[in-house]
Structures are given as C-alpha cells and as structure tokens.
Amino acid sequence: SRGLGDVYKRQGSRKLNAKNADLEYVVAGLRLAKHLGLSFGLVPFTNIGYNYSNTATIHIDENYTKTTTTNAYIGKGGLHQVYLGAGWEPFKGFSLGVNVSYLWGKYDRSIVNSYSDMSINTISKYYSASVHNYKLDVGLQYTARLSRQDQVTLGAIYSLGHRLNADPSLSIISQNPQTGIRDTTLFTVNNGLELPSAIGGGLGWNHRNQLKIGADYLLQQWSKTSYPNYTMANGNPQYVLTQGMFKDRHKFTFGGEFCQDANSRHFFQRMHYRIGASYATPYLKINGQDGPSEISVSAGFGIPIVNSWNNRSILNISAQWVRQDAKDFIKENTFRINIGLTFNERWFAKWKVQ
C-alpha cells in the first residue's frame, strides 16, 4: 500500500503545510494446510519527522534593544517491523493466531537553545537511540452464525510489553558563540526503552456478505512504562528512567463495508464501499499536561480487477483525515490518500495439464 500525505500544522497564529509520499506496507497471506494459514509482511512501526522553532523576547534594555531566545526542535527516524504470523482453526468458527516481529531502526532528536546576545552560551541537547529487538502478539477469534444471513465475530488480542535492550543517550553541548569554546556532557541509560503491554477486543457483524460492520477497542498500558528523562537533582544534572511520564491510551475504532454482490456481472455491484472512524486518548504528558488526542475519519472504495483468469483481486483507494489536538500545543491535521492492491489467492494458483 502506498500513501500520499498532506500535513497541516498550527500553533497560535503560526501555520505550516507539508506534503510527502511513502510506501506504507507490504503483507501477504497464504494457506499452508487445512485449517492452517501463514502471513508475513513489512510494515512501519513508528515514524518521527519534524523541524520547527519558536522565538521569544526575554529582555529589553534602556535603549530598547531586545534580547531574544530561539528554541529549534528537530526529530527524525523511526522503527520498521517485519513479521511472520500463523493462524490455526482447531474447530469450526474458532481460530488462534500469533505474530512474531523483528523491530529495527533509530531516532535522533535535538533541541537547540540560542540567544541573540552573543555573550550567552548556546545550549544544545541531542537525544538518540538504536533499537534491534522483537515484538510478540497473540490473538483469538470466534465466529458464530446467528441465522442463514447473519453471523457475528468476536476477537481479542494481547501484545507483550518488554524492554527493548536499547541504550538511549543524551549529549548536552554548551558553546560560547564568541569564543567557540564548548563543554560536552554525555549521559547514557542502559536498557532504557520499552514497549507497553496492550490488550484489545473487537466485535463484527456480517449480513449476507453484503454489509459488514465492526468495532474495536485497544488499551495500551503506557502508565506502567518508564522513559529516560533529563532532570536536576540537588543541583546535579541527571538522565534517568522516570515513571509517570505517560498515561494509558484508549483507542476506539468503528468501520463498515458494503458490497452489493461480489459475484455480480455488473461492475458497480461488485464495488466495495468503506467508511471508518477512530478516537484515541492522549498517552503523553507534557509539562504535567495531557498531550494530543487523535481523531481519524476515512472513506474509500475497492475496485474489482477483472481479467480472463482472475476476478477477485481488488484495487483499494481511500482518503483519511487525522487531527491531533491538545490545549496550548501544536494542532496537526493530516490528509492522506492511500492506494493499495489486494491480490486474491488465484494469482498464485498452480496450473494443471490434463
């Protein structure tokens, strides 16, 4: 799947508009044996990308000369995820599944505090870490038929929380702009990053394979995690693991799909029409305040691909709007166009010669 994004950010009277395009994910699934399936893929796990600054006046002398300070914030990097999953149906309607993933990547963040008065030192903080570790997810699903035309599906998932064996570091550089003299202090926290445990559940309803409606809930237990934090203790700087920087994140998702007749000879009756929406509470605390919550709305359709030997693959096109908002912080609106291709198993069918 490929995504095209248009990001609009606003803080007070300041506005920023940015565009980007990227490859979102590649996944595949196949049947290994009766009641046993396999899935694998490459998907993004986290993504960091920002560059902004703010300037404020801190002093005006008797000659009305202003002294200003500028804080510049830059972040880049992220984690990638490659996974291998298996699903097993021990009896009709009930399935178990497990995904084992490998995570890798790094992040770099910097905060540079400079002044218009060249006699005042510039303070730069550089945060970085590299991650190479695993992720484990398990789930179960049960489908019950309510009538000849209706069936309901219940599901649950659990993600294992654990430390990532990564050593985040912080470099603090104090430099005098006039003399160029600098002083550097380096901090490192051993095994300082971790994934939160997560648990979720979902409910789906299928009517005649025409109308499908689903709702999901996900709880990420961020409040139980700790994260490296730069503080002062008795006048001494320290970079240590700190709890209470996060709160649990709750995410609610709702979606629906309609296809009049997937086997119809009429093109528009085979079209898939989809809508979805989600809401997520903030998990990050910034200076004691809650970070941004997230609202997302999407709509799209699936176009059937028809040729002489395949009539079940689908070209998926959707539009998504995401808003992240927190009081007195940057408000971010993202508009994305997603294009993906779903291959049906007949693309990989074996030809037989009689």
Regions found by a protein language model. Give the residues of each.
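Subset of outer-membrane beta-barrel
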Residues: S1-Q354
